[in-house]
């Protein structure tokens, strides 16, 4: 009886491990071009400037198994600001990355890898810890389902509606030239 229980337990454990492994997509699926279509933050700068912000773009590429590069193109009143940041994977428990140069930790909260990703960023600047959530979409038109997921996750992190901005589309600032 004991052997049977142990065998069933091991079989169940193997089955759960196989199922979990089968549902974890290849990390490289998050690579490619993304539109930053929504933001949530409680920083003074964001709350003051959010109505002037437009949709940004990002291109994610993998440099190695545990390292990725993100190229950004963000429209500003005086032109298009572009930069790149390299992140290293810090955890096997989910997609968590850290950038030494930007002093920023990013975590993939939710994604289907095909159409949307919700990213949560934490950064320490001038002794203050700042947080921002971003909704990434593969196209400028984000699905209502992805928007609902973003708003739900924002609410779970105590962001109010005033702290969330859906960004208007723009065409002049792209990652294609980064």
Swiss-Prot record:
Keyword DNA repair: no
Assembly and binders: Monomer.
Function: Siderocalin-like lipocalin tightly binding a variety of bacterial ferric siderophores, also binds long-chain unsaturated fatty acids such as linoleic acid, oleic acid, arachidonic acid and, with a lower affinity, long chain saturated fatty acids such as steraic acid. May act as an antibacterial factor, through dual ligand specificity, both as a siderophore-sequestrating molecule and a lysophosphatidic acid (LPA) sensor.
Ligand binding (1-tetradecanoyl-sn-glycerol 3-phosphate): 72, 104, 134-136
Signal peptide: 1-20
Biological processes annotated in GO: defense response to bacterium; innate immune response
Residue ranges crossing the lipid bilayer per the database entry: none
GO cellular component: extracellular region
Protein name: Extracellular fatty acid-binding protein
